[in-house]
């Protein structure tokens, strides 16, 4: 029996339905470089199309007939180690993605290769000879037409566009017949940057002697500089001495200097910060710190909820914990939910830990993210600070992971793998026996439930750091504004408070709560909002058919212009920041308003916030990004323009999100020496969520919400699997969704699933039913996220993809989606 080296490969071209580690043969010329963790190119599928992959394992084995060989190795060394490969396998099993999708999530985007196949007509082959050799090859003529029309050479993508997807199969058949040849090239999106360095190749005395007589003054000056400074960049030598690069090359030929290349890291521009003094904690912070510090010493994986009111100084506790972890020779990771929060947090951490901190988030240039990743991988940093994807940073010996504002939905990925950062952090802490700190003033209901039942530990910060009182909150009834004939977004109560702040010269923040852009109906008299009788979520208004629909169970009813409760007029709710900005300019002529939303703030978050603080602009108007983590001492007033916009959307998390958002934004006021005030404008002032937020009463909100979730079997009492079917023909998509529902019901009757009393709902239109010309319907499985359920879900996804009736349609699944 002949033996050989066999590798298992995660192949990029493998869809989920056939995804697995594929076996390939290592050819003799690649034995030294084909090791686990390197990217490779491989032939894949019947047409042996060149595809990218990554080696997962390598073992000696039997050389089986038909086993395909690797084509090439793309990396000089592994880009994933054993821990990274294990994480990719876990992501695949947990989130129903392919192995390669998991690997791509872990590695930085700039590291990926673009595989290009260029096809040529074989040397000496004219069209007549090509036609003769291609006899019997199906559809060879149009492919040859396109190839010869392109001058005898073209990329596969160009030929596929002209002749269809089967062009690759035809070209390979022509290759076997000797008509065509293929040239494959792998090009990385970004490369390493280096700079040319120069140094003396001989002693300073000898160099001076060689340049003393016949050399120019610039050459002699270059020798003196290099003798004094040692190795320098060639550009610097030219700049300081006036010597030309050509002259330096001449000195190299003469043996006086030597050139070399040195890696140059592309690091983000950060505002310089002064080193901070000792971190001083108050009594309450010290108690929380000591509680968590004790957990970090157990040598076991631990999770703790650090719950503190807004302004209580949770960041100070994070800093002290990181300091403690670093003193023990371990490393730390601190994550924030929004890019807008990273600059302020980065300044505070850099002041404490200097260049030991690396920052990772999507607003950095791809080259900057890649170079930060390299620093982390080489062990040059001790602390990683970033947004969601920073959880995959290759940081070793991690002793602490912090998720600030852990309740935020931005911690969940919307693309495969659809992971939640909190779950990945728990996996890493279990692997590394480290501590996970979940920080929030308004923790997710599931997190609070886990802390209440002893699954997580809990530390509390009940007071603000400076002992300042929480802001006084006024709840303004917008129904009164309608009755008074005020159709604008700024009511009389808020207008009065803004006038007072302008008179005092203090700053204000206004939040337009635009989350959940779906329109809903609301009675302008009594505040009634039509809800689904089955799901306890607000019904969404569809203007196309004039109906109210539930996007969970599919319930539908005709909309009415009159309120079924009091007979009042039903109002369509929804607006935008630009309109509010215009209204503010009309109300307060000459007052500067800084608008910050997804459009105006793209890539400019830090500049806008710096301008607000530095220039003392009176009013900052924005969406959710102004609600969290910002600390401006001169802000004494916060206004919420329409609290209801996120409260009445068809999502079981609507109440939790609204309470969290209101609590967070109210907490932006009064963080300096002056008392803070807040105005919450709402059409439903008596709503329990609004009232709890006005009182900053998390416990009251939690007790109400947990009762509702237990009644409805929402998390944490069950897990919700959302199956979304999409396609270009609505009727076909709906039929496929019905088939998915029936298959789910059959699976739920199996003994291993039936014990959990699963329930199947739907199909119903997705909240955005048509996206990119694809219709979307979804079904819900209410059950338990355990191994039998995940295996059943995986089987269903593969069966759907392999069913020819579903050609042109996609099915994907989320578990406990935040959206």
Regions found by a protein language model. Give the residues of each.
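Accessory, non-ATPase domains that flank or precede helicase/AAA+ motor cores in DNA-metabolism machines
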Residues: 1-440, 452-468, 782, 787-819
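Small-residue-enriched segments and motifs
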Residues: 4-9, 24, 53, 473, ...
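Short, intrinsically disordered low-complexity segments
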Residues: 39, 756-785
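Generic structural signal for residues in well-ordered beta-strands
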Residues: 180, 257, 357, 475, ...
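Extracytoplasmic/periplasmic
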Residues: 731-746
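Short beta-strand elements
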Residues: 747-766, 807-814
């Amino acid at each position: 029996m002949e033996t050989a080296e066999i590798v298992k490969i995660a192949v990029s071209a493998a869809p989920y339905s056939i995804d697995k580690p594929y076996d390939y043969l290592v050819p003799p010329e690649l034995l030294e470089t084909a090791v686990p963790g390197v990217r490779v190119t491989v032939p894949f599928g019947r047409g042996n199309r060149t595809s990218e992959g990554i080696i997962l394992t390598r073992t000696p084995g039997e050389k089986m007939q038909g086993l395909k060989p690797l084509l090439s190795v793309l990396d000089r060394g592994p880009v994933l180690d054993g821990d990274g490969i294990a994480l990719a396998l876990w992501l695949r099993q947990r989130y129903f993605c392919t192995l390669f999708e998991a690997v791509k999530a872990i590695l930085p985007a700039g590291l990926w290769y673009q595989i290009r196949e260029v096809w040529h007509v074989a040397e000496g082959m004219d069209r007549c000879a090509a036609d003769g050799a291609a006899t019997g090859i199906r559809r060879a003529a149009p492919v040859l037409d396109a190839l010869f029309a392109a001058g005898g050479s073209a990329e596969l993508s160009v030929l596929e566009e002209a002749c269809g997807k089967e062009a690759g199969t035809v070209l390979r058949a022509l290759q076997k017949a000797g008509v065509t040849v293929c040239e494959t090239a792998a090009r990385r999106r970004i490369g390493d940057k280096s700079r040319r360095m120069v140094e003396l190749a001989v002693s300073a005395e000898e160099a001076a002697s060689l340049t003393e007589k016949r050399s120019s003054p610039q050459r002699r000056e270059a020798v003196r500089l290099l003798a004094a400074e040692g190795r320098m960049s060639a550009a610097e030598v030219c700049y300081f001495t006036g010597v030309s690069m050509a002259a330096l090359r001449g000195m190299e030929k003469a043996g006086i200097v030597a050139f070399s290349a040195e890696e140059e890291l592309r690091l983000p521009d950060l505002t310089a910060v002064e080193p901070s003094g000792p971190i001083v904690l108050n009594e309450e912070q010290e108690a929380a710190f000591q509680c968590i510090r004790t957990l970090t010493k157990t040598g076991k994986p631990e999770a703790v909820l650090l719950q503190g009111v807004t302004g209580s100084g949770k960041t100070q506790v994070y800093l002290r914990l990181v300091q403690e972890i670093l003193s023990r020779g371990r490393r730390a990771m601190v994550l924030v939910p929004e890019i807008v929060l990273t600059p302020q947090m980065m300044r505070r951490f850099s002041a404490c830990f200097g260049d030991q901190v690396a920052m990772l988030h999507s607003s950095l240039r791809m080259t900057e993210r890649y170079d930060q990743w390299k620093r982390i991988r080489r062990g040059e940093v001790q602390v990683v600070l970033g947004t969601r994807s920073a959880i995959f940073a290759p940081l070793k010996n991690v002793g602490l992971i912090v998720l600030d504002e852990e309740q935020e939905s931005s911690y969940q990925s919307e693309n495969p793998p659809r992971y939640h950062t909190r779950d990945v952090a728990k996996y890493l802490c279990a692997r590394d026996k480290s501590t996970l700190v979940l920080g929030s003033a308004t923790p997710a209901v599931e997190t609070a439930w886990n802390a209440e039942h002893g699954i997580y530990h809990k530390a509390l910060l009940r007071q603000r750091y400076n002992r300042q009182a929480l802001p006084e909150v006024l709840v303004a009834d917008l129904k009164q504004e309608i009755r008074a004939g005020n159709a604008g977004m700024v009511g009389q109560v808020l207008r009065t408070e803004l006038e007072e702040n302008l008179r005092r010269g203090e700053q204000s923040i206004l939040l337009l709560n635009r989350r959940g852009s779906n329109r809903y109906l609301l009675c302008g008299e009594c505040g009634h909002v039509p809800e689904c009788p089955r799901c306890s979520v607000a019904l969404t208004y569809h203007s196309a058919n004039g109906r109210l629909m539930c996007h969970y169970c599919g319930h539908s009813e005709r909309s009415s212009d009159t309120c079924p409760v009091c007979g009042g007029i039903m109002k369509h709710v929804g607006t935008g920041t630009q309109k509010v900005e215009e209204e503010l300019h009309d109300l307060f002529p000459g007052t500067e308003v800084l608008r910050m939303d997804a459009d105006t703030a793209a890539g400019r978050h830090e500049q806008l916030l710096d301008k607000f603080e530095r220039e003392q602009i009176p009013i900052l108007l924005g969406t959710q990004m102004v609600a969290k983590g910002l600390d401006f001492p001169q802000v004494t007033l916060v206004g919420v323009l329409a609290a209801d916009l996120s409260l009445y959307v068809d999502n079981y998390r609507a109440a939790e999100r609204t309470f969290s958002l209101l609590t967070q934004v109210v907490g932006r006021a009064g963080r300096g020496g002056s008392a803070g005030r807040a105005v919450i404008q709402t059409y439903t002032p008596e709503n329990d969520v609004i009232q709890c937020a006005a009182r900053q009463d998390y416990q009251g909100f939690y007790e109400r919400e947990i009762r509702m979730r237990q009644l409805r079997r929402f998390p944490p009492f069950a897990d919700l699997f959302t199956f979304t079917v999409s396609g270009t023909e609505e009727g076909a998509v709906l039929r496929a969704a019905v088939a998915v529902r029936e298959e789910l019901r059959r699976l739920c009757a199996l003994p291993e699933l039936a014990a959990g009393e699963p329930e199947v709902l739907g199909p119903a239109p997705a909240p955005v039913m048509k996206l990119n010309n694809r219709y979307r319907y979804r079904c819900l499985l209410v059950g338990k996220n355990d191994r039998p359920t995940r295996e059943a879900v995986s089987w269903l996804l593969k069966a759907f993809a392999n069913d020819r009736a579903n050609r042109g349609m996609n099915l994907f699944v989320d578990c406990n989606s935040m959206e």
